[in-house]
């Protein structure tokens, strides 16, 4: 959901609670006053949290609008994918020194160059790889025996299209939410950790290139996101 809806809803609730608070103070019901005050504080924390999420969404959208030149150019997809894979890994390691995963690359050397907006497709790759790292990192926290976090990044040519696949052996995506993952503001991450715009923007970017994003997932075993781009865009 749009985090501003939460901000508005909790603000409305607090207005009512504060009216009740005034009445209870007049009556001298200080036990009830304490209870209402606690509810108001709890709601303020939620407002603060969702407000920060809204802020990060706006910043992300502004960053995206500034970063994209909109100019397509012949781009080496293997080199671009490798560059953003390294960026994702080192960016995460800078924030979390304990993160570790086996990373495998399977690049099709015959891929050649295709016409894309490199910053935009790079943003898509970065988002998918960050999501894969998050998925395996969360599964590793479960301390399962012999679990080895693994992310595979693969490129290949398939039926006149270039495919970029990001595969993880995390917990997969439940069937109940698979249809929602490309919706704006939808996120499975804890409040404050995800904007819910990453996959939505990725979907729009790929669609603007005449391509599509597909997902295959098995709950408990992992997910594969496949970006398909036309060779002659």
Provide a role label for each language-model segment.
Residues 2-52, 58, 68-72, 92-99, ...:
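Histidine phosphotransfer helical core of two-component systems
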Residues 7, 198-202:
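Short alpha-helical Gxxx[C/S/T] motif in the catalytic ATP-binding
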Residues 37-44, 71-86, 104:
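A conserved beta-strand-to-alpha-helix junction within the catalytic ATP-binding
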Residues 77, 172-180, 194:
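Short helix N-cap motif at coil->helix boundaries in the Bergerat
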Residues 98-112:
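Conserved catalytic submotifs in the C-terminal HATPase_c
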